Swiss-Prot record:
Major location category of this protein: nucleus
GO cellular component: cytoplasm; DASH complex; spindle microtubule
Family according to the record: Belongs to the DASH complex SPC34 family.
Name of this chain's protein: DASH complex subunit SPC34
Species of the source: Eremothecium gossypii (strain ATCC 10895 / CBS 109.51 / FGSC 9923 / NRRL Y-1056) (Yeast)
A Pfam family matched in the record: DASH_Spc34
Subunit description: Component of the DASH complex consisting of ASK1, DAD1, DAD2, DAD3, DAD4, DAM1, DUO1, HSK3, SPC19 and SPC34, with a stoichiometry of one copy of each subunit per complex. Multiple DASH complexes oligomerize to form a ring that encircles spindle microtubules and organizes the rod-like NDC80 complexes of the outer kinetochore. DASH complex oligomerization strengthens microtubule attachments. On cytoplasmic microtubules, DASH complexes appear to form patches instead of rings.
Superkingdom of this protein's organism: Eukaryota
Length: 290
């Protein structure tokens, strides 16, 4: 009984020491899989696992130059090389007594140009619905064909550039400022004209069906809009006629016309109807944009 109690007390003391010193015994799977030699320290094993590289392969990638600095054998330089060179330059200038530069990291211009090209390519939109490929000599995409087709039509060319890049910068407007146009800024007629050329050059049934559906929808909305405009014009004409009939000159009020209550009611009714038609017209315009 006393031996078992002593054993339990020893285990408790060992656990307390482990918690106090933050030392925990590695699990058995780690011991069996990685520690093959009792003389090998855990620090070496963990360092090798974190680096995850073969020392022989590392040495084959780097070399030491005349100044004792590590360089890649393929000649490529990164941010570390640039910072190391800058630190050496600052140290040399400090020894010569030259004024120190401001603590700003000067990134080479080539790095910014490369990043700009990558970002520009990512921003290029590819409309796979109508098989728009990237503009390149190898692909021979539709953009190249369409731009050559509409070489003399600047509006269509601007629309193609907006489809490819998301937006296009046009010439100066009335305020002498350069104008940025997006795809939704172009007229519906111009977009349908471009789609008609696409389904003509590449006559696929799927694309033609979509184009005909869009064209029919546009005609329906256009007809409904024209009818509403005609109704609004008719209502305004009737309203003006009622205003002319309701004007009765009064000598006491310097010929100021005062419409009767019945005429005022009709006028208000016509105005309410015009407002309702204008709201319906605005709703049709929003539907056509979507």
């Amino acid at each position: 009984m006393s031996e078992s109690l002593s054993y339990c007390l020893d285990q408790i003391k060992e656990s307390a020491d482990s918690i106090a010193t933050l030392y925990f015994k590695p699990p058995g799977i780690f011991q069996n899989a990685l520690v093959h030699n009792s003389k090998t320290s855990y620090a070496e094993i963990i360092t090798r696992l974190i680096r995850d590289a073969d020392p022989v392969d590392e040495m084959s990638l780097y070399m030491t130059d005349k100044g004792g600095k590590l360089r890649r054998k393929d000649g490529k330089q990164g941010v570390y090389d640039h910072l190391t060179e800058r630190a050496a330059t600052l140290k040399r200038a400090r020894l010569l007594g030259a004024p120190e530069e401001t603590p700003i990291v000067h990134v080479p211009k080539e790095f910014y140009l490369k990043q700009h090209d990558i970002i520009t390519k990512k921003k290029q939109r590819q409309n796979r619905d109508f098989l728009f490929d990237e503009f390149s000599k190898e692909s021979g995409g539709m953009f190249e064909v369409l731009i050559k087709k509409f070489a003399g039509d600047q509006q269509v060319r601007n629309l193609l550039l907006a489809l490819q890049n998301g937006s296009v910068i046009t010439g100066e407007d009335a305020s002498s400022r350069r104008k940025t146009m997006f795809v939704e800024d172009f007229s519906v007629e111009l977009i349908l004209r471009l789609l008609r050329e696409i389904v003509t050059q590449w006559p696929l049934n799927e694309h033609r069906t979509k184009y005909e559906h869009l064209l029919q929808t546009y005609h329906d909305i256009s007809d409904a809009t024209n009818k509403l405009r005609a109704q609004i014009a008719d209502q305004e004409h009737r309203l003006q006629s009622q205003d002319a009939l309701s004007e009765e000159p009064d000598a006491d009020d310097d010929d100021v016309a005062h419409p009767t209550s019945g005429v005022s009611y009709l006028i208000q009714q016509e105005l309410d109807e015009i407002d309702a038609l204008e709201r319906e017209l605005e709703q049709l315009r929003r539907d056509s944009r979507t």
